[in-house]
């Protein structure tokens, strides 16, 4: 992506690097999840240009009959939700459980996307959405009826009922979240995985 759209809009005019990379999707296992060589997120933070390297590939794999998607920038979750919906992996209108240090609930400028056309979903995901606004369009389009956000110790008390898709940002394990014991976070997420229809996991490299 070379134009100032999607995740490439952040600090675009001030940056020396003007393009970010979207890795391809492969089917594989956890062994295929590895760091690539390309910049996938780039912004200026406190006068320092951050050039975050993403994954070599985005990975789809199955474990215990569940489909799991692993990717870098969190807005890719929107594409994988639509792909999974088209494949009948979950029912439209179920709940979303979002485990993340951040709420990611900002509103995009545009909600125009054909959910039945994955090429258009790809365009929308990468050229309209960014890492902070990908949940609202899924709610507005009725893909999910509601979202439960787990971003605190209180949030981990959630005991979901009914069908849900689980969305995880690995920044839930960042140092800023260390006020919640690591094993507690890990075990709660393991419990949520057991009941999920589909699981999306963002590495969030920035």
Model-inferred region functions:
Residues 1-206:
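Conserved alpha-helical scaffold segments that buttress catalytic/binding sites
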């Amino acid at each position: 992506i070379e134009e100032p759209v999607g995740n490439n809009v952040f600090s675009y005019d001030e940056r020396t690097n003007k393009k970010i990379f979207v890795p391809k999707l492969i089917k594989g296992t956890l062994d295929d999840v590895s760091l690539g060589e390309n910049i996938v997120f780039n912004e200026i933070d406190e006068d320092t240009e951050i050039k975050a390297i993403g994954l070599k590939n985005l990975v789809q794999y199955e474990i215990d009959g569940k489909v799991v998607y692993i990717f870098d920038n969190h807005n890719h979750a929107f594409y994988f939700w639509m792909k999974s919906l088209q494949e009948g992996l979950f029912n439209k209108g179920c709940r979303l459980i979002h485990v993340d240090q951040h709420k990611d609930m900002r509103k995009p400028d545009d909600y125009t996307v054909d959910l039945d056309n994955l090429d258009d979903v790809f365009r929308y995901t990468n050229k309209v959405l960014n890492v902070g606004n990908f949940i609202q369009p899924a709610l507005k389009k009725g893909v999910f009826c509601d979202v439960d956000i787990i971003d605190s110790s209180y949030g981990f008390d959630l005991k979901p009922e009914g069908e849900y898709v689980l969305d995880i940002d690995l920044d839930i394990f960042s140092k800023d979240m260390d006020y919640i014991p690591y094993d507690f976070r890990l075990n709660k997420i393991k419990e949520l995985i057991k009941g999920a229809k589909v699981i999306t996991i963002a590495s969030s490299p920035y």
